Amino acid sequence: MEEQLKQLEQEALAKIEAAASLKELNEVRVAYLGKKGPITDLLKGMGKLSAEERPKMGALVNNVRENVTAVLESKAAVLEEAAIAEKLASESIDVTLPGRAIKVGNRHPLTRVIEEIEDLFIGMGYEIAEGPEVEKDYYNFEALNLPKGHPARDMQDSFYISEEILLRTHTSPVQARTMEAKKGESIRIICPGKVFRRDNDDATHSHQFMQIEGLVIGENIRMSDLKGTLDTLAKKMFGAEREIRLRPSFFPFTEPSVEMDISCFKCGGAGCNVCKSTGWIEILGAGMVHPNVLEMAGYDPKKVSGFAFGIGAERIAMLKYGVDDIRHFYTSDTRFLSQFERTEA
């Protein structure tokens, strides 16, 4: 049995030495020291030996097992160190390589249009005013000369939350709130923000869109002041060569009311698909603040006057950037948005 032990030990040590990986080394351990390994079998067979042989053979078998175990652990440490070194070498980083540029985004076209309009009016002495998107019926309609039952309310199908609360259909309530708070003082504001209407979404309509309204109130404010303001806006957004025209219209909160058109920037008036062969493009609605609106806010229409206008940000962006479907602005499609990187100022 001693010869058998020496032979097993030599075989085990040789295979340990030949093992090139931790996996191979573990296979050697299982083969010789596992539950079914020969060294384990020898230990199990100790009971068959005589009382005189058992102590001597027990010591020999334990010595062989301890020696093989020690060599296994030593070899495992060497292989683990080699594996770590190999992994570090494969994952090394060349710090002299140039860094990879991070892909950065850019401003959304609607944001850019709104900021451009805000910058223009701030430069003209206007302030930016904001108000709640969930609004009272009074400020959304009644304070703007739209009492309950007024037929013009049907023009703006609304999202009502309760009988007296709704999602605002325009940013005009901000104007009504500002007039009420100013208590007869002069006003020069623009009111950008989201508005909501019960429209069916299509290429030119959305149930939610961005609107920018303007309001000026003071002494001797005339229609000529409104025209000059709108002319400045048109030239800023669509080019210095643009001309404007004002057409009579109707809005309950202004009197007189007008629609503003600009000369077509694509065909120069010759007629094209953008202007529908008219040479003019409709841009926005405006007018002089109705005396009833002034009175409800605490102003004396005999002493002060004012003008107001409303701009659809999507409308301006669609014309400015040649977008044919309003829904593109809301899809977060990078294929659409990335093209505006080239036009970033």
Curated annotation (Swiss-Prot):
One of its GO terms (biological process) is phenylalanyl-tRNA aminoacylation. GO terms for molecular function: ATP binding; catalytic activity, acting on a protein; magnesium ion binding; phenylalanine-tRNA ligase activity; transferase activity; tRNA binding. Pfam families: Phe_tRNA-synt_N, tRNA-synt_2d. Binds 2 magnesium ions per tetramer. It is found in: Cytoplasm. Mg(2+) binds at E255. The gene is pheS. It catalyses: tRNA(Phe) + L-phenylalanine + ATP = L-phenylalanyl-tRNA(Phe) + AMP + diphosphate + H(+). Tetramer of two alpha and two beta subunits. Disulfide bonds: none annotated. This is Phenylalanine--tRNA ligase alpha subunit.
